[in-house]
């Protein structure tokens, strides 16, 4: 199996065997680093990190990871450079076409990691994902998705690694992805969509629990159903949180809204009626302690 040079844009691009190999390698690297074993596998390598959006955990985990592996993470603030833009969306003296940025950076570094969603693409669902794919088209080095408006594959990889560490297996593990309240309507679907894909792909019994109005991408749901059938596991969508949480090994609460809400000013006010959808004091009793 050769994973060298591969992009990591969405989990579905990789096979189950490839993801399990990545998880095994992550296990080994964590053990080596904690045990004082040198892990300088990326000595003299550079990863360019382009953050169109704010980040605490993702940025610092990427920077720390590159340091631990002996390389350097070079942070690029799009407001301090000519902002990468798709063809037809350029602004004179402000942006630079993605095709040019990608080809310049791939001559200087070994990977380009990008976070982009929301305002930089006018909250157009799929716009940021298209930008990352444009980078992949023009770059000869790996393009890594640090979250776009559709997927957050590295977060999903960390999530399923945690499941593996805690339970040792995915088979028979009930993984519940639950919508949770937030006063902001500017929350992309990337995290929940990648989480349920990762859990379903690796064989968890996966439940998506949400209000009827908070549907995820139909293509993501179809992918989860396919993986569940392939693994002999289950995937279901529920609007009953109390029922969904019963017997769960993992309950993952996260807020998201549908793309239509980004453009609907009145939605913010209707949104508040879901504020009590998750009542932690009640539902915690239904979660099996592990």
Segments and roles (model prediction):
Residues 1-60, 64, 151:
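Positively charged, low-complexity intrinsically disordered leader regions
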Residues 40-164:
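Phosphate/diphosphate ligand-binding glycine-rich loop within oxidoreductases
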Residues 52-70, 164-253:
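Glycine-rich phosphate/diphosphate-binding loop of Rossmann-like nucleotide-binding domains
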Residues 88-93, 122-123, 184, 229-233, ...:
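Short, flexible loop segments at the rims of nucleotide/cofactor-binding pockets, characterized by
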Residues 96, 128-129, 189-194, 268-279:
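Charged helix-capping and loop-helix junction motifs
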Residues 117-119, 182, 255-260:
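Short glycine-rich anion-binding loops that position phosphate/pyrophosphate groups of nucleotides
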Residues 139-141, 204, 284-290:
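A short helix->loop->beta-strand "cap" motif at the edges of active sites that frequently abuts
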Residues 225-290:
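Rossmann-like adenosine-cofactor binding region
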């Amino acid at each position: 199996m050769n994973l060298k040079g591969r992009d990591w844009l969405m989990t579905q691009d990789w096979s189950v065997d490839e993801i399990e190999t990545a998880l095994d390698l992550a296990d080994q690297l964590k053990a080596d680093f904690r045990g004082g074993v040198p892990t300088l596998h990326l000595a003299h390598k550079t990863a360019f990190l382009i953050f169109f959006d704010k980040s605490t955990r993702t940025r610092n985990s990427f920077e720390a990871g590159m340091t631990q592996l002996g390389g350097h993470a070079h942070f690029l603030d799009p407001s301090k450079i000519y902002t990468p833009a798709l063809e037809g969306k350029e602004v004179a003296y402000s942006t630079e076409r993605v095709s040019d940025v990608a080809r310049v950076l791939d001559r200087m570094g070994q990977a380009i990691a990008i976070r982009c969603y929301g305002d930089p693409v006018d909250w157009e669902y799929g716009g940021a994902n298209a930008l990352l794919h444009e980078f992949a088209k023009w770059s000869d080095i790996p393009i890594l998705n640090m979250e776009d408006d559709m997927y957050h594959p590295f977060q999903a990889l960390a999530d399923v690694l945690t499941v593996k560490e805690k339970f040792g297996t995915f088979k028979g593990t009930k993984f519940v992805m639950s919508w949770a309240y937030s006063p902001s309507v500017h929350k992309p679907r990337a995290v929940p969509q990648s989480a349920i894909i990762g859990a379903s792909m690796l064989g968890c019994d996966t439940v998506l629990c949400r209000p009827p109005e908070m549907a995820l991408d139909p293509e993501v749901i179809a992918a989860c159903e396919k993986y569940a059938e392939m693994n002999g596991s289950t995937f279901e969508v529920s609007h009953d949180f109390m029922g969904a949480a019963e017997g769960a090994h993992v309950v993952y609460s996260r807020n998201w809204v549908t793309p239509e809400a980004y453009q609907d000013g009145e939605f913010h006010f209707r949104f508040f009626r879901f504020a009590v959808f998750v009542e932690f004091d009640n539902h915690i009793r239904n979660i099996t302690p592990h």
